[in-house]
Amino acid sequence: MIGRLRGTLAEKQPPHLILDVNGVGYEVEVPMTTLYRLPSVGEPVTLHTHLVVREDAHLLYGFAEKRERELFRELIRLNGVGPKLALALMSGLEVDELVRCVQAQDTSTLVKIPGVGKKTAERLLVELKDRFKAWENMPTIAPLVMEPRASATVSSAEADAVSALIALGFKPQEASRAVAAVPGEDLSSEEMIRQALKGMV
């Protein structure tokens, strides 16, 4: 099991990134909540990781905090929840927001996540309620720190943001509309994704 990687951020193409560790490039998939906290390409970064072994591939998932990784592990233990849906849930909601959603049994918020229908949301809330009792007193994740990406043009940032939303399960039309509705100019793709998800969820 690969539990942690420390290296240089070589590439960042949401929701994937390449982490260079002593000359070896590890492809890692991350939730958007982790992506927002990543430094610029070329900077050092440490990720807490979870390895999924399948017959056709070994897949690495990375997280900025151990708490995020533990949430991911809790989610994929649930019946019918795979890594893709777990990442979609974690991209749409911060850890604390998801915990509060479960405590309040709030299906209306969960159904806004791609891949989550009403029945799935109701089942997730029931199954997670007892599991999340221990999470109430855990330390919260550090505030998000956005890194500027001066080299990115608006058009490429928009394209990256749309691609990331589609990878999370949103329909192309939904992703394009959400990104187009983001206010402001010269935003990084990470900020566009964050604002678009906020508007959709």
UniProtKB/Swiss-Prot annotation:
Residues 144-152 are annotated as: Flexible linker. InterPro entries: DNA_helicase_Holl-junc_RuvA_I, Hlx-hairpin-Hlx_DNA-bd_motif, NA-bd_OB-fold, RuvA, RuvA_2-like, RuvA_C, RuvA_C_sf. The keyword Transcription regulation does not apply. GO terms for cellular component: cytoplasm; Holliday junction helicase complex; Holliday junction resolvase complex. Residues 1-64 are annotated as: Domain I. It is found in: Cytoplasm. Gene3D superfamilies: 5' to 3' exonuclease, C-terminal subdomain (1.10.150.20), DNA helicase RuvA subunit, C-terminal domain (1.10.8.10), Nucleic acid-binding proteins (2.40.50.140). Residues 65-143 are annotated as: Domain II. GO terms for biological process: DNA recombination; DNA repair; SOS response. Residues 153-201 are annotated as: Domain III. Its main location: cytoplasm. Keywords: Cytoplasm, DNA damage, DNA recombination, DNA repair, DNA-binding. GO terms for molecular function: ATP binding; four-way junction DNA binding; four-way junction helicase activity. Belongs to the RuvA family. Has three domains with a flexible linker between the domains II and III and assumes an 'L' shape. Domain III is highly mobile and contacts RuvB. Probably part of a ruvC-ruvA-ruvB operon. Does not seem to belong to the SOS regulon, no LexA binding site has been identified in the promoter region. Homotetramer. Forms an RuvA(8)-RuvB(12)-Holliday junction (HJ) complex. HJ DNA is sandwiched between 2 RuvA tetramers; dsDNA enters through RuvA and exits via RuvB. An RuvB hexamer assembles on each DNA strand where it exits the tetramer. Each RuvB hexamer is contacted by two RuvA subunits (via domain III) on 2 adjacent RuvB subunits; this complex drives branch migration. In the full resolvosome a probable DNA-RuvA(4)-RuvB(12)-RuvC(2) complex forms which resolves the HJ. The RuvA-RuvB-RuvC complex processes Holliday junction (HJ) DNA during genetic recombination and DNA repair, while the RuvA-RuvB complex plays an important role in the rescue of blocked DNA replication forks via replication fork reversal (RFR). RuvA specifically binds to HJ cruciform DNA, conferring on it an open structure. The RuvB hexamer acts as an ATP-dependent pump, pulling dsDNA into and through the RuvAB complex. HJ branch migration allows RuvC to scan DNA until it finds its consensus sequence, where it cleaves and resolves the cruciform DNA. Complements an E.coli deletion mutant. This is Holliday junction branch migration complex subunit RuvA. It comes from Pseudomonas aeruginosa (strain ATCC 15692 / DSM 22644 / CIP 104116 / JCM 14847 / LMG 12228 / 1C / PRS 101 / PAO1).
